[in-house]
Curated annotation (Swiss-Prot):
It is a multi-pass membrane protein. Expressed in roots, stalks, leaves, immature ears, embryo and endosperm. InterPro entries: DER1 (IPR007599), Rhomboid-like_sf (IPR035952). It is found in: Endoplasmic reticulum membrane. This is Derlin-2.2. Belongs to the derlin family. SUPFAM superfamilies: Rhomboid-like. The chain crosses the membrane at residues 22-42, 97-117, 123-143, 153-173. May be involved in the degradation process of specific misfolded endoplasmic reticulum (ER) luminal proteins. It comes from Zea mays. GO terms for molecular function: signal recognition particle binding. It comes from the Eukaryota.
């Protein structure tokens, strides 16, 4: 069993493995009280006035306490991060890293701007960690790249992957969870998808071209990946209590 887990871990692509490792280490460290979540959460005042710049990164690494919900989040993170890195971004590690960096920037910007708008500022002030939103962004981008994959919600009904983010959002509403996390991830994912996939087809220009200094950090081969219209890829488990599995083709 241990050997199988080790092999599974070693076979992960570099970005997925690094992010998953950082998330697990951070959450375990907080659970064991080695570090405190109060030193990790997003606080614009502390970032600007006290130069605690690390909060811009650490708020994406903490997934709350270790419980069943945490395990589902880690499964979701590992699955969709890996699917994107190995398929849509195969041979383009720098582009994938830039996607995550762009998504994190958009999410942070939304929270900062929302915190300055009357009537909704209190809602955004309660958003301390954006790790779940970044994971949801990856789900959204994956669904846009694989819209025709057939999926099943707990065997109750089937749908195509294009509707996966909306199914998960509906489940959050059904169980009474906050939908802000999902909505922020969907917004960031759609902004990225539009600028990277839709806008270039409309204008011939690519505004999100990965900077050369980021490309220099990764040794990639140029690989063109053909995406099949249908593939046996499931959604895994929903945050906390939901299973979404592929429908047999």
């Amino acid at each position: 069993m241990a050997q199988a887990v080790e092999e599974w871990y070693r076979q992960m692509p570099i970005i997925t493995r690094s992010y998953l490792t950082a998330a697990v280490v951070t959450t375990v460290g907080c659970t064991l009280e080695i570090i405190s979540p109060y030193h990790l959460y997003l606080n614009p005042k502390l970032v600007v006035q006290h130069y605690e710049i690390w909060r811009l990164v650490t708020n994406f690494l903490y997934f709350r306490k270790m419980d069943l919900d945490f395990l589902f989040h880690m499964f979701f993170l590992a699955r969709y991060c890996k699917l994107l890195e190995e398929n849509s971004f195969r041979g383009r590690t720098a582009d994938f890293f830039y996607m995550l960096l762009f998504g994190a920037t958009v999410l942070t910007g939304i929270v900062l701007i929302g915190g300055m708008i009357p009537y909704i500022s209190e809602t955004f002030a309660r958003i301390l960690f954006l790790s779940n939103s970044l994971t949801f962004m990856m789900v959204y981008v994956w669904s846009k790249h694989n819209p025709f994959i057939h999926m099943s919600f707990l065997g109750l009904f089937t749908f195509t992957a294009a509707y996966l983010p909306w199914v998960l959002l509906g489940f959050s509403i059904l169980v009474g969870s906050s939908t802000w996390v999902d909505l922020l991830g969907m917004i960031a994912g759609h902004v990225y998808y539009f600028l990277e996939d839709v806008y270039p087809r409309m204008t011939g220009r690519r505004p999100l071209k990965t900077p050369s200094f980021i490309k220099a950090l990764f040794a990639d081969d140029n690989v063109v990946v053909a995406q099949p219209p249908n593939a046996g890829i499931g959604a895994g488990a929903r945050f906390g209590a939901i299973g979404v599995d592929p429908q047999a083709q």
